[in-house]
Amino acid sequence: MHNDVIKVSSETIIKPKGIVNVVYFSSPSNNTHRFIQKLNFLNSRIPWNLDEELEMNEDYVLITPTYSGGGNLKEGAVPKQVIKFLNKKQNRNFCRGVIASGNTNFGDTFAIAGPIISKKLNVPLLYQFELLGTQSDIEKIREILINFWRK
């Protein structure tokens, strides 16, 4: 388990309102994009171009890949586009949870972007999956998100 993983108190978790909504980042390889399309939920993509912006005004769960070198190298784990998006207070305020992908070859830093964001925003880390994800990951994440949105 990452030492960056924190336990978010159930009293501090803000349950999302509205319909299931995902905000995600995907590089030009579109790996995360293809995964998101299989979830079949309302979604918005954080732009690759740092000059473009996305502003959220409704609750969402963030799904992001991890960029990291493994070992103790955590610097650069959260894509700079995601950092820019979350630097906007309004975008942070509507984030209700995070899901991250990564590569298990990187050991302790596998999907570390999730724990980093979870800790920074004090939102739950809902799930982590490897690389492109599997059909099982898609089914688990769908179930997690549907249950998370339930009243």
Placement of each model-derived feature along the sequence:
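FMN-binding flavodoxin-like domain, especially the glycine-rich phosphate-binding loop
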Residues: 2-14, 58-151
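Short, charged N-terminal beta->alpha structural module
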Residues: 13-41
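Short, surface-exposed beta-edge/turn micro-motifs
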Residues: 20-21, 57-59
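Conserved beta-strand scaffold positions in the cores of enzyme catalytic domains, especially
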Residues: 22, 43-45, 98, 125-126
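Short His-Asn-centered micro-motif
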Residues: 24-26, 46, 63, 101
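Short, catalytically relevant binding-site loops at active-site mouths
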Residues: 29-31, 50-51, 67-69
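Short, flexible loop segments at the rims of nucleotide/cofactor-binding pockets, characterized by
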Residues: 39-44, 73-77
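A short, well-structured beta->alpha microelement
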Residues: 41-55
